[in-house]
């Protein structure tokens, strides 16, 4: 099972539409939801962004930050759908995930047990605690 983390805490995963692997993305303009690996080039999705409802980006390790870059690039390319980080994202990384463009984080039950909801909620005020805002005073 998976737990979805948002700014309001833990929630069950209610997404029931499934995901298509990036390599199997249909060539037509059918609305879809895509699983993107951490080594993907998001530029390959540029002509399909309006057809994609949700993109779920894999984090194979908490030390692998490529997913943050992919999310940021997708937002800069104009993706307005839902972005979900999936995998080994830690509570300490939640603010960075939100700042880079993610709407939510999907973690497994084991990680949710090791890092309970209160640890994630402590990072939920991600807009108020960013480095550039502190520099501006």
List PLM regions with ranges.
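Glycine-rich phosphate-binding active-site loops on the catalytic face of alpha/beta enzymes
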Residues: 102-120
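Catalytic cores of alpha/beta
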Residues: 43-47, 90-104
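C-terminal helical cap(s) of enzyme catalytic domains, especially alpha/beta-barrels
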Residues: 114-137
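A structural motif
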Residues: 52, 79-80, 102
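Glycine-rich beta-to-alpha transition loops that act as phosphate-gripper elements at the mouths
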Residues: 84-90
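Glycine/Thr-rich beta-alpha phosphate-binding loop at enzyme active sites
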Residues: 29-76
